[in-house]
Amino acid sequence: MSCHLIQQIENQQRKEPAETFRVGDTVRVHFKIVEGKTERIQAYEGLVLCFKNSGVRRTFTVRKNSYGVGVERIFPLHSPRIERVDVVRAGKVRRAKLYYIREKIGKAARIKARIVKKPSPSA
């Protein structure tokens, strides 16, 4: 009984991302920041290291290098604060978690590009 209620509430809170992305993709996350009374949108661009959990609790970790220091940020996938997620570059990886990238430096931290086929317009 209570499981059904929880699932109903979670389904109401679920938000489908406009563009799907995978682990290994370089993404730009646009999210809202509230500073006092003002609200602005900030972009955070980096490599998707992993997805965790499922349902409404699903999160993804994005890693970027900022002035030579690796910075990671965890975003809830269905958060109302996330405006949109744009895929900058599709990556080809064979792992679900890319934690090994943390130890890599420079060219060793590169990810191969994945060729994405776009649907052709039907005339």
Curated annotation (Swiss-Prot):
Cited InterPro entries: Ribosomal_bL19 (IPR001857), Ribosomal_bL19_CS (IPR018257), Ribosomal_bL19_sf (IPR038657), Translation_prot_SH3-like_sf (IPR008991)
UniProtKB keywords: Ribonucleoprotein, Ribosomal protein
Record's keyword annotation contains Ligase: no
GO cellular component: cytosolic large ribosomal subunit
Gene Ontology molecular function terms on file: structural constituent of ribosome
Pfam families: Ribosomal_L19
Matches recorded under PROSITE patterns: RIBOSOMAL_L19
SUPFAM superfamilies in the record: Translation proteins SH3-like domain
Gene Ontology terms: biological process: translation
Claim: Nucleotide-binding is one of the keywords in the record: no
Similarity field: Belongs to the bacterial ribosomal protein bL19 family.
Task performed by this protein: This protein is located at the 30S-50S ribosomal subunit interface and may play a role in the structure and function of the aminoacyl-tRNA binding site.
HAMAP family, alphabetized: Ribosomal_bL19
Protein known as: Large ribosomal subunit protein bL19
